[in-house]
């Protein structure tokens, strides 16, 4: 390497040439600014400078730094916590002294230690010398004191009188007596201790088996018992009781030890016999004796159980909690006898945050109560109604009762005449005469028993009873004129009887007329499903004449025979129950109801709950207007005292408490409006699908009326052919002529549609249609009627659902959005992309995600749809794994209506 000049070296190191020349001279090298400098000279200068500035020596000082970072979680406002970083810095400096200073410090420390040792030695010598002098002085004083005491004692002995021989003999005698007493007491104590030990051993042997059984039962209970800890008051009380019993068993009665007592007596006697016997020493002796007595008794009595642990009741005391439809947290806590906070904690464990006033549904409250170990009893809104109706007579004797018969038929076929003849012939003389009935029901006595007849003109009460689920009639008598045959109202009566499931007896009336043709009646009735016994059927046919009385007795015998087959029985004693046959509002008496008693005995003064009304029976009258005080089963009676007019068909029940009866009646009145509104929606064609029950065959009930018999048969056959496996057409009533009130009532009771072909409904029928919201339709073309019925049946079919693809977009690029996430830049290749429609994400023609759109934009604007051939940005909700090349498919679900 070429040599450099001093001037050039000065420029390289950043110093002036004069300063560098001066440093060279100090190092013993003489140079000028223009002289060259060799490498050896540079090294010589560097060594000089290091030596001058201490660079060649070892470092005398060292500094160490350390930094640690930790994170603390600090609670902030609003119950949220935040993290705070804490940084700790430490710095330590170590200084190394030179050897001279180290030697000087070591010498100083050594000199200081030698000085301390010399001082300690001198102090020890001085202390030993002082101790020796003090000991000598104390010995001299003690010797002088002893000499003085000996001198005083000798002087005292010389001065005191000598002890006499009698006193010495008395003292010896007392010592001998005391020794004898001690020996006797010790022997007695040993004997009692041995007896106590033997008693304890005997008790242990006797109770060993019982203790073993108790221990085994306790362990079994712990294994099989419910260890779920509850916070109920009953559980805590059970634990406290178990603890108290365990403590009582542990505290066995102690027998006082004779040894201990004698020892105490001897010690007390000894203490009293000498001075200071009642001092501190005497108290200590008594305390020692008590401790020894306790220890001996503890050893002599065997414990009942060696288990020293806490005895918690293994079986949880379960309380019965009654929960209604809804209950608040505070009410539930009160029923469970716990604090509301315990329920809130339990629900927090179950994942629900509630407050003390929050209302829980029945299912949630049941889960909470069962989780806390209680037995739950679910109650309904009408629980009071069930309780009132269930609080009746218990096990009572069931006896046969009279049949209840309803007479039906065409108005011109002699139904009224037949009723009048039976009444005139069978009612005993002397009663309120006349054939005018005060009420719509009466009973007659025959030689074979009693029969109760219901007069139901227009069949209104019968239909209303069946619609309300009340079966008041046991047998139906169908009156048919022998000279007139089957008429439309006769067919209606047959349909009513079949719908109610009531046995039917046919009374062929006017048999005394010359033009009577009973065989024609049998033939016509057989076409409607009523077959005579002579023809192999099940229906009894009786030929009667309401004018001459022919066949009346046979008819009554047939009724009683049918009742025997039915085996009609009822409770005769106890609280009554029945059904309202008819009711009215009398100007002078108020609400009046005719009740047919079905079981029990109705008495004057009973509390009656009758549908929406209630009241106390103030007066009772029979069918003849005669006041009575009680009525048994199958007896019609007129009662007064109800709060309002009940409806025909309402159930009348005797209850115990008038206040509860009023509560039930008010509850029923509040519920009546909802039930009525719900009933109005049943038979609408538009709501047929809502009435469908999955898995069951649907039925479309129809009441069909036509102008001529030919059209009626053609329509009925066509409608029956429409029935399928899923929907069935059920024509519950058909006939020729206009739509009557009976047809409307039957349609309302059966949830049917009234269909009229070239006929119309009368005023009374339209009134029922309006009040019951029955669907009424008129037709003049058969095909139009069939098409609309087919459409109605199609509406009852379960619909089909189909998914149609309405758009397809291809992902060209993916962008990231801080709010939404991955945004797919797409080109619409098919159809239209709609924001509200569900989507599928396809990758290599395989569906990998199905969801919905969160964002659809074109440029920066939110749009509702994007058409084919346009670009857009698509954000998929809850999905960020969209890649380039994916396809986004937009589809919609279309409901396909099924047709027959």
Curated annotation (Swiss-Prot):
Region described as G1: 409-416
Keyword Nucleotide-binding: yes
Gene Ontology CC terms: cytosol
Residues holding GTP: 409-416, 455-459, 509-512
Positions of region (G2): 434-438
Compositionally biased intervals (Basic and acidic residues): 119-158, 165-191, 198-229
Xref: SUPFAM superfamilies: Initiation factor IF2/eIF5b, domain 3, P-loop containing nucleoside triphosphate hydrolases, Putative DNA-binding domain, Translation proteins
Main location: cytoplasm
Biased composition (Low complexity): 257-272
Residue ranges of the region described as Disordered: 119-306
Domain tr-type G: 400-569
Family per record: Belongs to the TRAFAC class translation factor GTPase superfamily. Classic translation factor GTPase family. IF-2 subfamily.
Protein name as annotated: Translation initiation factor IF-2
